[in-house]
Amino acid sequence: KANIKPEDIDDVVMGCVLPAGMGQAPARQAAINAGIPNTSGATTINKMCGSGMRAAMIANDQLLAGSSLISLAGGIESMSNAPYILPKVRDGLRMGHGQVQDHMFIDGLEDAYEPGRLMGSYAEATAEAYQFTREEQDNFAIRSLKRAKKANEDGSFEDEMVPVTIKTRKGSIEVTSDEQPFNADINKIPNLKPAFSKDGTVTAANSSSISDGAAALVMMT
């Protein structure tokens, strides 16, 4: 899409928070699958909520420092493929109950310092601290959805999107547009129950969804 030869890219920096089960070095995999040679650098960044943006910042720093002339930066995430983890199974479970942990929760959606506390509760606390009302959050979400739908329908980002082919039991499916905006029913948004607090304002509709996606930027001096 950027009309850049793969061999001209000096370094690849990709954000990924849920890498379990993806195989080693997701950034290197992305680079190789894009035809970028092994002589180029490849680094995977794990930073909560902002790994893709942090990847772009690191690529920018490398360009300014002169360690790269052309860099590829972005993020890759597949929340639907996040596996379940079996702690202590490697050494063998003993008497008593074992536990299955959700990689998406334990390494992504739960706070590491307050076990069991979901990150969405911090969004709730932030909304309360800054007095963001439920109506304001819902209106923001609705406006975002409408913009996303319009952009998909009129092809605003068509030149920046690459079709993805998914193999299923019934055959191959080609995904050519962002599916998520069309899964939401805008009319139901104002009536949804709070997700993290009984009297809260954050809902499944006005917060981030469980989804898969990837994006990349070609950056140069």
List each model region and its residues.
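Conserved catalytic cysteine-centered active-site region
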Residues: 16-71, 113-119, 183-209
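N-terminal extracellular/periplasmic Venus flytrap/periplasmic-binding protein-like
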Residues: 136-221
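Conserved active-site "lid/cap" helical segment
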Residues: 1-22, 26-34, 41, 125-134, ...
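Flexible glycine-/small-residue-enriched beta->alpha junction loops
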Residues: 70-126
